[in-house]
């Protein structure tokens, strides 16, 4: 039986909380893209890994909280607070994302995330994430 979008989302959030980059990346393939709108998307495994890797590596804890969600066919709309703990300090960012899935393969194919990256980068500059 085909996997449901909500099951992919829950498994993906679990992988993030385990901070296991191989497990996180197993949800994507070469067709996948993740866009922090309005910035250009990260396309394919390598680019998406480059996006996730620094923050996952720096964080001692990761927790993405879903505030509200809607599911239809192969899509999910997720209002979230993405929370990262770096050197004992919590950094959180509010996001609204549209996720599209390849249900037979259980993959995340596209993400369009709407987030104020300016504010996020300002906060993270304090954590020296770009070292």
PLM feature spans:
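Short, low-complexity N-terminal intrinsically disordered segments enriched in polar/charged residues
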Residues: 1-30, 127-131
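Helix N-cap and loop-to-helix transition residues
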Residues: 4, 20, 43-44, 116
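A beta-strand edge to alpha-helix "cap/lid" segment located at domain peripheries
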Residues: 4, 53-131
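Phosphate-binding glycine-rich loops and adjacent basic patches that engage nucleotide phosphates
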Residues: 8-18, 42, 59-63, 82-85
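Hydrophobic pocket/interface hotspot
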Residues: 9-12, 24-25, 32, 44, ...
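A solvent-exposed, acidic/Ser-Thr-rich amphipathic alpha-helical stretch
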Residues: 21-75
């Amino acid at each position: 039986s085909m996997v449901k979008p909500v099951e992919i989302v829950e498994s993906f959030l679990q992988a993030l909380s385990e901070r296991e980059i191989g497990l996180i990346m197993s949800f994507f393939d070469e067709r996948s893209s993740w866009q922090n709108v309005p910035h250009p998307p990260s396309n394919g495994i390598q680019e998406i890994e480059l996006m996730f890797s620094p923050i996952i590596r720096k964080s001692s804890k990761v927790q993405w909280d879903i505030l509200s969600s809607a599911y239809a066919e192969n899509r999910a709309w997720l209002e979230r607070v993405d929370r990262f703990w770096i050197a004992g300090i919590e950094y959180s960012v509010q996001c609204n994302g549209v996720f599209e899935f390849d249900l037979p393969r259980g993959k995340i194919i596209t993400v369009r995330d709407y987030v104020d990256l300016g504010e996020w980068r300002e906060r993270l500059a304090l954590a020296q994430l770009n070292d």
